From Swiss-Prot:
The chain crosses the membrane at residues 28-48, 55-75. This is Transducer protein MpcT. It comes from the Archaea. The gene is mpcT. Residues 580-590 have a biased composition (Low complexity). Residues 78-132, 192-247 form the HAMP domain.
Amino acid sequence: MNITQAYKRSLWWSMDMVGATGSVERKMLTAVGLQFLAAGGMAFLTVFTAGTVQLIGVGGMLALSVVAFYNTYLIAEADFVEPLVALEDAADDIAAGEFERADIPSSKRDDEIASLVASFDGMQSNLEVASRQADALARQAFDDPALDESVPGAFGESITEMADSLEAYTAELEDKTAELEHQQAELERQSEQLRALVDALSEATDAARAGDLTATVDAAALDVTDDHRAAVEDFNQLLETLADTISDIQSFSDAVLAVSRTTDERVDAVADRSAAVSESVTEIADGANQQTNQLNNIAAEMDTVSATVEEIAASANDVAKTAQAAADRGEDGRGEVEETIEALRALREQSQAVAETVESLAAEVERIDGITALIEDIAEETNMLALNASIEAARTGSDGDGFAVVADEVKDLAEETREQAADISEIVDAVTEKAEDASIAIGEVDAEVERKITKAEGVLRDFEAIVDEVANVNHAVQEISDATDQGAQSVTDVVGMVEEVASVSEETAAESDTVADNAAEQTDATDEVADQMDELAEQTAALAGMLDDFTVPADAGTADQSVADDSPTAQPPAADDEPAAAVVDQPQPASDAEDEEGVPDSGGESVAVSDGGWADDRSSFTWADSQ
């Protein structure tokens, strides 16, 4: 044990003796009290002692101050710095998630710092337990002993609830897993059933493709569901329907063969009759064409006459339009002349009004001139009075100075008034001269306006005469235009009638040609129909040979056949279980090509069946389910 540790022990023993270790506050007060006591002692010695005693006392107080400072340092380091630094390190470890590495220092004291350390240690323990529980939940180790440990507060309750929820969820997942395994086994069983069903359907389909329509699928021998059993029954029903249809087609092909032979004979008779009709219609068409040519010539001549009349009518219309335009222009010119006369008359009235205004102005100027003369007379008399007043003022001497001044002012005013009156007189003379000039000019304007009015009235009379003459010309031209229009309309009506007759003749010729062509085409068509009926007979025989390759049940196609003798289309009655209707399209022109089996090309002939249709195209059968 060194001196420092011994001193620390003695220091804390002494603080225990005085009861200062139980509180940080008392520790600090004790250290500060010692320093204050040393400072107070030094002050006391400085005031009340002197000499050697003072020096010894001050030295002792200084040593006491050093001891008090050192004690304060030891207390702060041991009770404050070291515990707080340790708590900081532990908090850093906890913040980093290292709960087990957090080392909380123990404290043997019972002050506030010791209480803080104890609380922090409890928090670290709870966090460590929570960490172990979270790890156990993550590993789904619900029997881990850590889950039995309790964590106080709401956080511990949350951990417990989370553990219970996870355990329940895990149990539910186990149940779902077992259910999925059961469903997987069921799916595997159904897959085996479907595989067996597909194999059976494949064998039956191969047999049907080979022509054996008696090969069906035994649904009772297969372990399948009701839906799959219904599909098997539909497939078997489909084969039965196909067998019935093929049997009906076999019967139908025999009927078609008989009908084709009868039709061939009738077609030959129709061909002979069509040839005779074609010759007669050709003769009618030739006569209609000749008549049409003659009518077309007449119509051409009438078109020429109509064009000439229309040109005359157009020329007359142009002349009428020109005359009407001239009349309109004459009317417009007369209106403009009348407007000009009215404007000149208004100008004359305005100039007369201006002349009257100028004369009134001259009269007023003369009045101003009289007033100006009166002002000059008054100014002259005022000047004379001022002169007399000056003479009287001079005669009275010094007593008349004031009167003399007034006389001078009056004299000056009279002089100024006379000068202004002279200026006004000059202005009045100038205004009078201008007014006289304006009056002369206005008189000249009135004379000129009067001449213009007289001339415009003469022009107006000329315009009225022109308008009357143009109106007469326009009326005459209009009568000519109306007459030519009527003539043109008459010619047009005649041309229309001729053209209508020619059109009827052309239509008759065209229809005759059409009838002749149709008769020829009918003859060709009957020949072609005869050829096609022969080909149909050959194809029907080939179809019967191909149908013989199919194996059908003995009771298939038991329905009777009904064939019309005069129609190439036959509809055999349907079977009892599935209604079926066969329609044979009109045969197309046959080709000379044959397929590999030596069967003539059908040329596009097809036989359609409404339920489960099949088609014969170039001697090959293709199954097409018509749904």
